[in-house]
UniProtKB/Swiss-Prot annotation:
GO terms for molecular function: glucuronosyl-N-acetylgalactosaminyl-proteoglycan 4-beta-N-acetylgalactosaminyltransferase activity; glycosyltransferase activity; metal ion binding; N-acetylgalactosaminyl-proteoglycan 3-beta-glucuronosyltransferase activity. GO terms for biological process: chondroitin sulfate proteoglycan biosynthetic process. This is Chondroitin sulfate synthase 2. Residues 54-67 have a biased composition (Polar residues). The gene is Chpf. PANTHER family: CHONDROITIN SULFATE SYNTHASE 2 (PTHR12369:SF22), CHONDROITIN SYNTHASE (PTHR12369). InterPro entries: Chond_GalNAc (IPR008428), CS_glycosyltransferase (IPR051227). Glycans are attached at N138, N361. The chain crosses the membrane at residues 16-34. Keywords: Cytoplasm, Glycoprotein, Golgi apparatus, Membrane, Metal-binding, Mitochondrion, Signal-anchor, Transferase, Transmembrane, Transmembrane helix.
Length: 774
């Protein structure tokens, strides 16, 4: 009874007692028991390396610091007796008002971390061979390797463009090489790991050299002197060999740094007739390193050309050689480059084929088996649409027609790039089929039954072809055959096209041809121009072209139809003192776009950037800047598509101001080309081609507009894109019967498409029919 009562009293205190006991136990286990001496004593000869005994035993924590006599300096050998003591740097806070000294940092983090680039190629050339062999080396090597420098003895009058040429001031071979080494050490010694010296009479295979430099490491090749080994001249019994300079020499940075203090003594003491032998003797005497042709399983392969030996593509020596020597002339250099490039291309195709086989074999081990690998191997799988609106459309075509046309017509003939694309796909399909079935069968194409193609942004252009074939056997048999073939033209590597530099600071001249019937719209255009250009001080000017009809021109002195427009222009010039808005008056009954543009072009310099606008155009700063960026002199003309609001009786009603950008409120007018951005020089060049290429200039001047002129008679890129910053309200645009047939058709098409969407027009007709039936 008493025992149970005692246990009931002690039971709440049991966990506390167990916790305290466990804590003491863990504390004792975490203590390291060591012996510390009372004081240091000088080591005696013959003493063992055991720690000296002290007269106290103390418990020390693992992260505590021992007395200075017990810790030796890091890196010092055992038994040296040198003690290491920490040096405490006192902290002195800055005095009030005293400028603190800023830490000096390097410009690039790679310099501070000591990160160096991999390879520098130094081409030893001369003033006589720099314009010939030097240029050939630069064209075959400079585009593949980033850092190539040409070291010549004396600089000529004209240095080839695009080449880094350094004149050393010494034409003699040994002196030239000596100064070249000094230049590399002084200017690039701390920037690169490897230095490759090669004469300009040697072809260098850039891909192989890049792979070699990427494989080597300074950790395992500190002193590397790599090239074609050759014995010293004169039967010298000195151990070691030198590298033949004609086939290139690869030097490590460490070896070149050790050679620096010995360059002058080598220049004065070593006598040799060949610069490469002089370099080999200098390296051997200074560092004891001789030339080697192998390192870590990699062999320095070279190709020694015989005099007059022709270059034969497919020679197996081109697959492994890094350099070829000697090269006779630039033509010989380009022939070697073609042969080496073909060998490198075959090597790349073989690697791609091996990778495809490896992917196919590995995909069989996946959970989905062979279905896990996409076709073709290495190309992303087809995109899966998230909804029915994202389904990619297949376009049907035959050998003569396409059934998906840009203008919306149901059928259009294949022309230009589309026709060449279909012919190329058919030829490739037949070639692949014959490669698979030969020599058992010889297939010939009879006709294309069905053709489908679609563009997948993740893959490229996909094709599905139903081919009617005729199979021929070696015995002479023939029978018809139908096969379905799937092909893919994959997207290649995305590249940024080099284009001339453009800026938003270019001065822009806005041109506005204004007819008398459109004079009421001039006020809104002028105010929009003032808001977008004059108020912010933008570099933009405005020129008006006032189009008078013959009767209006006769009464211009008494009742000028453009008097309100001229008054508004004068008011703008008063509001903005630095602004000048000139106008030109033209009398014409049937204004031709090209004739009007000819008149405006003659009034401005050739380097003027034009923005051709219409009275409905609402200028904004964003559109002005896009016009400057998209119009490139000698390269590109920009024709934006504005957003045209639908008829207010068809579309939902909108308030004042610019129309709302939406599918039910308007559309981008593909038929209109009233806005254009181009340079005057490009327009003059296109007009010159029109005069030279056509005998019917007068007829074309009446039937063409500026857009058609650039499309047909200019070599520029014509950029046609939607412009969300150009918003125009609906206006019943009149189509003059005096226009040419093509321009009149485009005008009528623009008017009809601007009434409303198909759905809105159908609903309007349905409501009218319902009203008539009742």
């Amino acid at each position: 009874m008493r025992a149970s009562l005692l246990l009931s009293v002690l039971r709440p205190a049991g966990p506390v007692a167990v916790g305290i006991s466990l804590g003491f136990t863990l504390s004792l286990l975490s203590v390291t028991w060591v012996e510390e001496p009372c004081g240091p004593g000088p080591p005696q000869p013959g003493d063992s390396e055991l720690p000296p005994r002290g007269n106290t035993n103390a418990a020390r924590r693992p992260n505590s610091v021992q007395p200075g006599s017990e810790r030796e300096r890091p890196g010092a050998g055992a038994g040296t007796g040198e003690s290491w003591e920490p040096r405490v740097l006192p902290y002195h806070p800055a005095q009030p008002g005293q400028a603190t000294k800023k830490a000096v940092r390097t410009r690039y983090i790679s310099t501070e971390l000591g990160i160096r680039q991999k390879l520098l190629v130094a081409v030893l050339t001369s003033q006589a061979t720099l314009p010939t062999l030097g240029v050939a080396v630069n064209r075959t090597l400079g585009h593949r390797l980033e850092h190539v420098v040409f070291l010549t003895g004396a600089r000529g009058r004209r240095t080839p463009s695009g080449m880094a040429v350094v004149a050393l001031g010494e034409e003699r071979p040994i002196g030239h090489l000596h100064l070249a080494l000094r230049h590399l050490l002084e200017q690039h010694g701390d920037d690169f790991d490897w230095f490759f010296l090669v004469p300009d009479a040697t072809y260098t295979e850039a891909h192989g050299l890049d792979r070699l430099a990427g494989h080597l490491s300074l950790a395992s090749a500190t002193h590397l002197y790599l090239g074609r080994p050759q014995d010293f001249i004169g039967g010298d019994t000195t151990p070691g060999r030198y590298c033949h300079g004609g086939f290139g020499v690869l030097l490590s940075r460490t070896l070149l740094q050790q050679l620096r203090p010995h360059l002058e003594s080598c220049r004065n003491d070593i006598v040799s007739a060949r610069p490469d032998e002089w370099l080999g003797r200098c390296i051997l005497d200074a560092t004891g390193v001789g030339c080697t042709g192998d390192h870590e399983g990699m062999h320095y392969n070279y190709l020694e050309l015989s005099p007059g030996e022709p270059v034969q593509e497919g020679d197996p020596r081109f697959r492994s050689a890094l350099t070829a020597h000697p090269v006779r002339d630039p033509v010989h250099m380009y022939q070697l480059h073609k042969a080496f490039a073909r060998a490198e291309l075959d090597r790349t195709y073989q690697e791609i084929q091996e990778l495809q086989w490896e992917i196919q074999n590995t995909s069989r081990l996946a959970a989905d088996g062979e279905r896990a690998s996409a076709w073709p191997v290495g190309i992303p799988a087809p995109s899966r649409p998230a909804s029915r609106f994202e389904v990619l459309r297949w376009d049907y075509f035959t050998e003569q027609y396409a059934f998906s046309c840009a203008d919306g017509s149901p059928r259009c003939p294949l022309r230009g790039a589309d026709q060449a694309d279909v012919a190329d796909v058919l030829g490739t399909a037949l070639e692949e089929l014959n490669r698979r079935y030969q020599p058992a069968l010889q297939l010939q194409k009879q006709q294309l039954v069905n053709g489908y193609r679609r563009f997948d942004p993740a893959r490229g252009m996909e094709y599905t072809l139903d081919l009617q074939l005729e199979a021929l056997t070696p015995q002479g048999g023939r029978w018809p055959l139908t096969r379905r073939v799937q092909l893919l033209r994959p997207l290649s590597r995305v590249e940024i096209l080099p284009v001339p530099y453009v800026t938003e600071a270019s001065r822009l001249t806005v041109l506005l041809p204004l007819a008398a019937a459109e004079r009421d719209l001039a006020s809104g255009f002028l105010e929009a121009f003032a808001t977008a250009a004059l108020e912010p001080g933008d570099a933009a000017a405005l020129t008006l072209l006032l189009l008078y009809e013959p009767r209006q021109a006769q009464r211009a002195a008494h009742s000028d139809v453009f008097a309100p427009v001229k008054a508004h222009v004068a008011e703008l010039e008063r509001r903005f003192p630095g602004a000048r808005v000139p106008w030109l008056s033209v009398q014409t009954a049937a204004p031709s776009p090209l004739r009007l543009m000819d008149l405006l072009s003659k009034k401005h310099p050739l380097d003027t950037l034009f923005l051709l606008a219409g009275p409905d155009t609402v200028l904004t700063p964003d559109f002005l800047n896009r016009c400057r960026m998209h119009a490139i002199s000698g390269w590109q003309a920009f024709f934006p598509m504005h957003f045209q609001a639908f008829h207010p009786a068809v579309a939902p009603p909108q308030g004042p101001g610019p129309p709302e950008l939406g599918r039910d409120t308007g559309h981008f007018d593909r038929q209109a080309a009233s806005e254009a951005c181009f340079y005057n020089s490009d327009y003059v060049a296109a007009r010159g081609r029109l005069v030279a290429a056509s005998e019917q200039e007068e007829e074309l001047l009446e039937s063409l507009d500026v857009y058609e002129l650039f499309l047909r008679f200019s070599n520029l890129h014509v950029l046609r894109a939607v412009e969300p910053a150009l918003l125009q309200r609906y206006r019943a645009q009149p189509c003059s019967a005096r226009l040419s047939e093509d321009l009149y058709h485009r005008c009528r098409q623009s008017v009809l498409e601007g009434l409303g969407s198909r759905t809105q027009l159908a609903m309007l007709l349905f409501e009218q029919e319902q009203g008539n039936s009742t």
